[in-house]
Amino acid sequence: FWRMEKEGSEAAAEALKELGLDVTVTAQAASGESDVQGQETVMKAMSNGDYDAIMVAPISDSNLTAAIEAAQEKGIPMSYCNDKDANVDLPSVVADHKDTAELAAKWIAEKIGEEGQVAVVQGLPTAEAARLRTDCFVDYMTANYPNIEVVAQQNADWDRTKAKDVATTILKANPDVKAIYANNDTMAMGVLEAVK
């Protein structure tokens, strides 16, 4: 996902260059999708750098609040990408987590014949995206597929290795699970490793 975000930004920059604008895209990230302190460090460094604008995707609801406010005080234009900070209102281009979760629920229901047990591997619990993707998936399943039971929900914090371990635990406790919904592609790869 993040590689695609970076590639899309770079492609947009190239298109703007063709129009005569001088645009450079720099992508920086924390060491992992649950490294909230690392992301704050990166954000502070960027706000102290020579950037004309910053687009940010907070890992949690509030880990970047102070860093975003500091960048705003310096007059750096900012926007959100994918997720928002709960405390600072900025323009945003974000995913529709409800729609994504409902599409996943429909797809899974179709694949398992609209009956059976399913489980959820959730991202970082302090991230709105993880909560929305999980809650909307479960709510949609419950409301629309009475013969499908969500038997387990566990956090894996956006981490592939944790997702593999969580999925292994879920499958041992619930051997009749027909599908596992992961909140992101990184965790889905871990779930896939557990299933193999």
Language model regions located:
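A residue-level marker of the well-folded mature domains of exported/periplasmic proteins
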Residues: 1-196
